[in-house]
Amino acid sequence: MICPHCAFDNLPGSEQCGNCQADLTQLDRPTAQDRVERSLMEDPVSRLKPQQAVTLPPGATVRQAIQAMLEYDIGALLIVDDAGRLVGIFSERDLLTKVASPNLDHMDRPVSDFMTPNPETVRPTDSLAFGLHKMDGGGYRHLPVLKDGQPLGMISVRDMLRHITSLCKTCFF
């Protein structure tokens, strides 16, 4: 990638010129080929209208977490401290891989024993592609949406697919 300021030949994908330290981040950006790609690259996460976060404190029991997930028909809960800061996420996957056992004593243990601590998050202003990349790279089905460090909501793979499908309906018909 040739620097437009000094003509230095940088490695492809370089963020900064190796010679003059000029910002190169805008030079190697992919261009959208269709409406779906453009939406993923340009639309913010807020476009998905993230569902409101359902939260519990770390001391809530697994039983309470399951009851909340059933009551709100959701696949994941955000675990927040007394100041409202995100400390973890408890998902259906956590329930199946960490809690499920013949030992029912787990039901009254704190959800913090089984949650995924410090989960990956997105901001409402992040691009859909950024969120999708985090989901794909980490194997996540849910991502908390934080604004100023506080949980604002959550997006899911289903939300992404619903958005892409809505764009494709007009692409093919």
Model-predicted regions and their roles:
Residues 1-173:
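Tandem CBS (Cystathionine beta-synthase) repeat/Bateman regulatory domains
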